[in-house]
């Protein structure tokens, strides 16, 4: 399920497209004495692997983002949406062909989608101690976890005017699930292995930035004649209306049955993080969340955005007590499970990212492959079993 979940997300929008000028294309990075080698350089010999281009072209799903537009699913989506050619429609290409100049558009999401148009920093970044000057010349500073997360989320979640909205999902686009550390590892990573502390910070920053960005999207949709359903938990509507439904058995504490529920997946993970790092902000978050599905949604979303932005800046600079965060998630797993499949996905990826036994999460990923069969009690039992093996 882990691979399936990530494949679905990569089949959809991927990474944000910066300014349309200055791209050189992936081939410009493929020199054998730069990033185009066939084997990784020994540790200590170079700060880079040297075979990043091969990693991307052979194993990275980003390299097949253009291809997704030409396959049966992509063609059928274009037909349903009334798009003549998805490979030339900005709604699709803004993310599926990010980082590729026109002449190499079939490369899909290439190096410069993540690292920035390289025209002015390609030569600079080969020199020692050149990172800061390269960033000033247009390189995206992926060492900065907030910037890295925002770069990914611009397409793996969306920003105003560039998003997978309900129309696209209804036409066949997969819903987007994203967690920074899990997706970085599955890309696959084309850098030296990172210390656990850095990976844990990546998870924390990714959760905080993801929540802030989702709240900005929610605010951008306010005031429209109808809600943007992609802001919501999908399966509150897309489920069987059977009398024995777990939703009916659970009840609707604090809201009327049928009230639309904002997707709370990242809220629950940030709750767990605040329980460990900033308890004083936890109460503020809970108060704002209580008003997300009311007439004061915009003000509540703004308050949550502020909390999440502050948290992202804070956790980028400090180590995370991963075990304590996992205890906070596990202690609240019933409520997380009751929030639905999207929240369960984030809890699973959190256990994968912060735990010590990745294999133990496999049954959780397998279970979430079939969201129509999802039952909170079953997910809770599987999560507790996997958590006990960490």
Residue ranges and their predicted role:
Residues 11-14:
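N-terminal signal peptide c-region/cleavage motif recognized by signal peptidases
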Residues 18-37, 224-233:
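Local sequence-structure signature of Cys/Sec-based thiol-disulfide redox active-site neighborhoods
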Residues 38-79, 113, 117-336, 372-381:
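Primarily the internal scaffold of c-type cytochrome electron-transfer domains
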Residues 22-30, 88, 107, 145-149, ...:
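Short metal-coordination and nucleic-acid-contact micro-motifs, chiefly zinc-binding Cys/His arrays
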Residues 27-35, 93, 112, 153, ...:
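Cys/His/Pro-rich metal-binding microdomains
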Residues 77-113, 129:
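Post-signal peptide N-terminal segment of secreted/secretory-pathway proteins
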Residues 1-7:
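Sec-dependent signal peptide recognition
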Residues 331-342, 347-390:
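A cross-kingdom marker for long, charged
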């Amino acid at each position: 399920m882990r691979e399936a979940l990530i494949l679905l997300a990569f089949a959809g929008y991927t990474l944000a497209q910066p300014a349309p000028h200055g791209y050189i294309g992936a081939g410009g990075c493929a020199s054998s004495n730069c990033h185009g080698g066939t084997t990784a350089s020994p540790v200590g010999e170079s700060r880079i692997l040297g075979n990043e281009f091969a990693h991307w072209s052979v194993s990275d799903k980003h390299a097949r983002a253009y291809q997704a537009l030409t396959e049966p699913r992509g063609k059928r989506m274009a037909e349903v949406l009334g798009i003549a050619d998805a490979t030339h429609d900005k709604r699709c290409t803004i993310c599926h062909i990010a980082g590729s100049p026109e002449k190499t558009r079939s490369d899909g999401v290439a190096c410069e989608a993540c690292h920035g148009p390289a025209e002015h920093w390609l030569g600079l970044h080969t020199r020692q101690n050149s990172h800061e000057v390269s960033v000033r010349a247009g390189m995206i500073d992926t060492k900065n976890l907030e910037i890295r997360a925002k770069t990914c989320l611009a397409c793996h979640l969306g920003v105003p005017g560039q998003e997978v909205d309900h129309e696209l999902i209804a036409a066949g686009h997969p819903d987007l699930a994203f967690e920074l550390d899990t997706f970085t590892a599955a890309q696959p990573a084309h850098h030296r292995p990172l210390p656990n502390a850095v990976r844990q910070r990546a998870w924390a920053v990714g959760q905080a930035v993801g929540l802030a960005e989702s709240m900005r999207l929610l605010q951008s949709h306010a005031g429209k004649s109808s809600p943007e359903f992609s802001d919501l938990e999908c399966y509150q509507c897309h489920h069987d209306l059977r009398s024995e439904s777990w939703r009916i058995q659970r009840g609707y504490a604090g809201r009327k049955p049928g009230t639309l529920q904002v997707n709370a997946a990242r809220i629950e993970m940030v709750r767990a993080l605040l329980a460990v790092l900033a308890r004083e902000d936890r109460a503020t978050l809970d108060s704002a969340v209580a008003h997300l599905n009311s007439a004061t949604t915009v003000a509540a979303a703004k308050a949550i955005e502020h909390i999440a932005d502050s948290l992202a800046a804070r956790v980028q600079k400090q180590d995370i007590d991963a075990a304590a965060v996992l205890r906070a998630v596990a202690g609240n797993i019933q409520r997380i499970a009751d929030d639905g499949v999207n929240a369960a996905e984030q809890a699973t990826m959190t256990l994968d990212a912060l735990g010590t036994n990745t294999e133990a999460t496999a049954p959780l990923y397998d279970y979430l492959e079939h969201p129509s069969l999802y039952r909170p009690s079953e997910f809770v039992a599987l999560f507790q079993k996997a958590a006990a093996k960490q």
